[in-house]
């Protein structure tokens, strides 16, 4: 997840007041005769590596865990604990998500991202918000622009009000019109499904830490999360650009659906390693907020997305977040010497949206920011 609106002074060298690019249009940029525009070229030490090794991540049989078979539960706890303590990434299979929903949600992305620019801009994200269409970060920065487009939605399982409104479906209908009715229905169902799945994974994470099974589930039952479609167009010089720059997710838990185009890389053991797509498996990773909730026991790891020279890559990401006023504090069983202060998700979200570009030090910089503000 990348959240960039405003940066501290020491990061403002990336701020662009007179960026000549108005919108990210990969079709136009790829047909320029000379080279990729400099705005999208990353520094040499951050450019994609060749011959990246494959990261060995455990595959968790979620159905086995949910069966309550003692042996299967114990094995799932062991695998997830080992991964979460080292790098925070693992795969889940037999997760119960309908294959037709996964397939339809992936295919429907083209309905939006292959639309004319004027159509996509109907949903343009407003400054300071997490919802809407973002065209790289054109117009906001002049360096290290990601080679991607995104469409993001806010979601909460408690969002149904007296008139049974549904935020994902209604947002799409309001911004894009009735022609996107099926589009909205599918992604509303997708967000609801991933929210439910994330709560099951939270049960596993809680048990693997030796705390009550329901502790994290109950903490996130009224979550206020973010659901995002990531569209990484092919690039004629993929060795110069990044689809998403190196960062740790500031959120709690990410569930990522990859397509069959590899692109996810994680920085482990001082090198970039890839997590190639596995059919029907979903990638799960720990975010900064969950790292704070576990008092630093489980890790949020640096990762990035690279792009392909031959084909477009599409992913769907559900970022589980607490209700904005929930206090992020480890359970008593994990407290000991505190690694991070108490904070609310709204405070951390404000920091990542207004003050800091997410990277590997976001949580530490946030802690320092709180100290300087005298918030604790």
Curated annotation (Swiss-Prot):
InterPro entries: DIOX_N (IPR026992), IPNS-like_FE2OG_OXY (IPR044861), IPNS-like_sf (IPR027443), Iron_ascorbate_oxido_reductase (IPR050231), Oxoglu/Fe-dep_dioxygenase_dom (IPR005123). Keywords: Iron, Metal-binding, Oxidoreductase. Induction: Not controlled by the level of physiologically active gibberellin or by auxin. Up-regulated by paclobutrazol. It comes from the Eukaryota. Expressed in roots. Detected in leaves, inflorescences and siliques, but not in stems and dry seeds. It catalyses: gibberellin A12 + 2 2-oxoglutarate + 3 O2 + H(+) = gibberellin A9 + 2 succinate + 3 CO2 + 2 H2O; gibberellin A53 + 2 2-oxoglutarate + 3 O2 + H(+) = gibberellin A20 + 2 succinate + 3 CO2 + 2 H2O. Disulfide bonds: none annotated. Binds 1 Fe(2+) ion per subunit. Residues 222-322 form the Fe2OG dioxygenase domain. Fe cation binds at residues 247, 249, 303. It is an enzyme of class 1 (oxidoreductase). Its EC number is 1.14.11.-. It holds the Pfam family DIOX_N. Pathway: Plant hormone biosynthesis; gibberellin biosynthesis. Its cofactor is Fe(2+); L-ascorbate. The active site is at 313. One of its GO terms (biological process) is gibberellin biosynthetic process. One of its GO terms (molecular function) is metal ion binding. Belongs to the iron/ascorbate-dependent oxidoreductase family. GA20OX subfamily. This is Gibberellin 20 oxidase 4. The lineage of its organism: Eukaryota, Viridiplantae, Streptophyta, Embryophyta, Tracheophyta. The gene is GA20OX4.
